[in-house]
């Protein structure tokens, strides 16, 4: 086994004495820092490399702190108006994961960079911490490499806002097989539109 495989196995045993101590100390350290800051290097080099990170120019790691829990509806004094079915304010659950929220915040802060992927690095009772891999699309090392040229194209601007990253795709219900019938055709909306459109063919 290579070194990265050993690191991977260490991270799989998060309840071991060593990892519990490490995660507690790291959470304390991350809480002292700002909610969004640049990390000098990935905390989990094995995971970062599996997600596409390379230790070379053009790659950046940002660490994001996201508050845990559901999403409260942002209305003044709970005044939602309308019908009682839509009066809920407190016990609502956000459709996307906290990881995708972290990616979005990193993408907003670093508007010139492209979000490649992200991974979990720790959590406590109040916060979850994620590290986001960002790429500089105008760096020559990225533009000249055939493996990374794809992310320099304009179509990949703010892919984290449009649910195109790995964490973003998970909440869209995409997949193959009988469990994913509600997104046949590319999205929930496409599936709904096809099922709710009456087609009267000329020859039927």
Swiss-Prot record:
InterPro entries the record matches: Rbsml_eL15_core_dom_sf, Ribosomal_eL15, Ribosomal_eL15_CS, Ribosomal_uL23/eL15/eS24_sf
Signal peptide positions (record): none
GO biological process annotation, one example: cytoplasmic translation
Keywords per UniProt: Cytoplasm, Diamond-Blackfan anemia, Isopeptide bond, Lipoprotein, Myristate, Phosphoprotein, Ribonucleoprotein, Ribosomal protein, Ubl conjugation
PTM sites of type Phosphoserine: 34, 97, 100
Domain of life: Eukaryota
Chain segments carrying region Disordered: 165-186
Alphabetized GO MF terms: cadherin binding; RNA binding; structural constituent of ribosome
UniProt feature, compositional bias: Basic residues: 169-182
GO cellular component: cytoplasm; cytosol; cytosolic large ribosomal subunit; cytosolic ribosome; nucleus; ribosome; synapse
Residues where lipid is bound covalently (N-myristoyl glycine): 2
Keyword flag Ribosomal protein: yes
Subcellular localization, as worded in the UniProt entry: Cytoplasm
Position of the Glycyl lysine isopeptide (Lys-Gly) (interchain with G-Cter in SUMO2) cross-link: 83
Family: Belongs to the eukaryotic ribosomal protein eL15 family.
SUBUNIT field: Component of the large ribosomal subunit. Interacts with IFIT1 (via TPR repeats 1-4).
Purpose of the protein: Component of the large ribosomal subunit. The ribosome is a large ribonucleoprotein complex responsible for the synthesis of proteins in the cell.
Disease annotated for this entry: Diamond-Blackfan anemia 12: A form of Diamond-Blackfan anemia, a congenital non-regenerative hypoplastic anemia that usually presents early in infancy. Diamond-Blackfan anemia is characterized by a moderate to severe macrocytic anemia, erythroblastopenia, and an increased risk of malignancy. 30 to 40% of Diamond-Blackfan anemia patients present with short stature and congenital anomalies, the most frequent being craniofacial (Pierre-Robin syndrome and cleft palate), thumb and urogenital anomalies.
Protein name as it appears in the record: Large ribosomal subunit protein eL15
């Amino acid at each position: 086994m290579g070194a990265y495989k050993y690191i991977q196995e260490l991270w799989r045993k998060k309840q071991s004495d060593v990892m519990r101590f490490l995660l507690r100390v790291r959470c304390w350290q991350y809480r002292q820092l700002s909610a969004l800051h640049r990390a000098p290097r990935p905390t989990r080099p094995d995971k970062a490399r599996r997600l596409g990170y390379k230790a070379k120019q053009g790659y950046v790691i940002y660490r994001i702190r996201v508050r845990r829990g559901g999403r409260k509806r942002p209305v003044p004094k709970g005044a939602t108006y309308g019908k009682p079915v839509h009066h809920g304010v407190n016990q609502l659950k956000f459709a996307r994961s906290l990881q995708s929220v972290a990616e979005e915040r990193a993408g907003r802060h670093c508007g010139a960079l492209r979000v490649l992927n992200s991974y979990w690095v720790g959590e406590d009772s109040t916060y979850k911490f994620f590290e986001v891999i960002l790429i500089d699309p105008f760096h020559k090392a990225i533009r000249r490499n055939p493996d990374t040229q794809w992310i320099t194209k304009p179509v990949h601007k703010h892919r984290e806002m449009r649910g195109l990253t790995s964490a973003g795709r998970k909440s869209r219900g995409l997949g193959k097989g009988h469990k994913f019938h509600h997104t046949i055709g590319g999205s929930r909306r496409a599936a709904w539109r096809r099922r709710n459109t009456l087609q009267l063919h000329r020859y039927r």
